[in-house]
Amino acid sequence: MDAVLEPFPADRLFPGSSFLDLGDLNESDFLNNAHFPEHLDHFTENMEDFSNDLFSSFFDDPVLDEKSPLLDMELDSPTPGIQAEHSYSLSGDSAPQSPLVPIKMEDTTQDAEHGAWALGHKLCSIMVKQEQSPELPVDPLAAPSAMAAAAAMATTPLLGLSPLSRLPIPHQAPGEMTQLPVIKAEPLEVNQFLKVTPEDLVQMPPTPPSSHGSDSDGSQSPRSLPPSSPVRPMARSSTAISTSPLLTAPHKLQGTSGPLLLTEEEKRTLIAEGYPIPTKLPLTKAEEKALKRVRRKIKNKISAQESRRKKKEYVECLEKKVETFTSENNELWKKVETLENANRTLLQQLQKLQTLVTNKISRPYKMAATQTGTCLMVAALCFVLVLGSLVPCLPEFSSGSQTVKEDPLAADGVYTASQMPSRSLLFYDDGAGLWEDGRSTLLPMEPPDGWEINPGGPAEQRPRDHLQHDHLDSTHETTKYLSEAWPKDGGNGTSPDFSHSKEWFHDRDLGPNTTIKLS
């Protein structure tokens, strides 16, 4: 990557404006192209000017002031880049997988107020000041002690040390300088912009030797991370890369000389991977490559732990929802059973009420139906009777009724003419044959002279005038009783001269003790 990038020109190290373009910087250009004077005083002044320009460039950058991507992160979420690159998740409360001693939370509360570790996770430059240390004399024998102090830092946590005692003294030759420079951190100027509480500090488990991080997250150099603006208050999650004390600030790796401060997690990971711990600047290619790999693994571990934490929270939320829904379901089942029991009870009561209503209403209804049928039958009978009285009688019946009415009168007229002391019956012999006249057979006529006939004399022995007179009388009686609608010659068309067997009339005296015999 260093071969691809163009060499950084020397005139860009100290630009005329207050804005310093950090996009074109890389580690090799910064370490190789930076030229400093030989004298210490001039070196101190140039370092102060450079640090001031570098420190002010972060505040004068309008892009970072207006919108910083690191300021838009939530408290409980990692950086967007890490969240997008790492989607795997394990258990959020996984214990450290390394047998090394984990970092304790109690060690971080001592220096939290001084903002010592805020320099590493705020990605801002610090002002360095060269001072002469009268307490440390120039001695060639100080080199072994400095190396011993650097080796002790690999196993001793640095969180409990003060900002001045935390920084090792670099080893320099006696001919170069008479007194060793001391880097002094000014926490007062940093704390006015950076305020980190002890709760924001995170304790991460050490990286296991077998862990292999993703190359996608470590493809970028630590210097290429966008710096954050310290003007705005930082209220972000301590698990994010930009706010994590587990990674060294990128600007600390860009120095040309001086001690190299690494975090405890970086040192532990380097030891677990078998890499030597770099203690001073500049870094070699191998050290830079190893440090990049370690930082990439740390970021992957942070992302994985954040994913596991979120997954655990999500699962816990789902479990709570399941419990809530289960309890609600049980309550609803109880309500359903209660409603079903109430429904059965109501159905039984309804059946009983229907039975009672049917028993009470059926009897009067049947009686009313019977009475109605009876009334209808009586009305129909009355109607038939009235209608029958209004129908006119047929002519046959009317003539018959007239005959019935007039027959007694005619009979009275006939019987009044009789002067016989007793009643006599007229009859004819059954074997005598046909009647002489059809009309005469309807009403037998008696001779006007009397009811008595000559005894012992047949009909042919009577005189001829008597027969004619009888025929006229019968015709007169027939026309008197019959209607004019009948033809005069008779409906049967029988002639009055029709001959028939002779009839025998018997005239007998009817006494009180006599009986009538028919022959």
From Swiss-Prot:
Protein name (record): Cyclic AMP-responsive element-binding protein 3-like protein 1
Physiological role: (Microbial infection) May play a role in limiting virus spread by inhibiting proliferation of virus-infected cells. Upon infection with diverse DNA and RNA viruses, inhibits cell-cycle progression by binding to promoters and activating transcription of genes encoding cell-cycle inhibitors, such as p21/CDKN1A.
Effect ascribed to mutating R423A: Abolishes proteolytic cleavage by MBTPS1
Side Lumenal, residues: 396-519
Nucleus in keyword set: yes
Organism superkingdom: Eukaryota
Cytoplasmic side: 1-374
Annotated site, Cleavage, chain positions: L426, F427
Pfam families named in the record: bZIP_1
Upper taxonomic lineage: Eukaryota, Metazoa, Chordata, Craniata, Vertebrata
TM region(s), chain numbering: 375-395
Residues covered by the bZIP domain: 290-353
Motif MBTPS2 recognition: positions: 392-395
Organism: Homo sapiens
Tissue specificity as recorded in UniProt: Expressed in several tissues, with highest levels in pancreas and prostate. Expressed at relatively lower levels in brain.
Compositionally biased region (Basic and acidic residues): 499-510
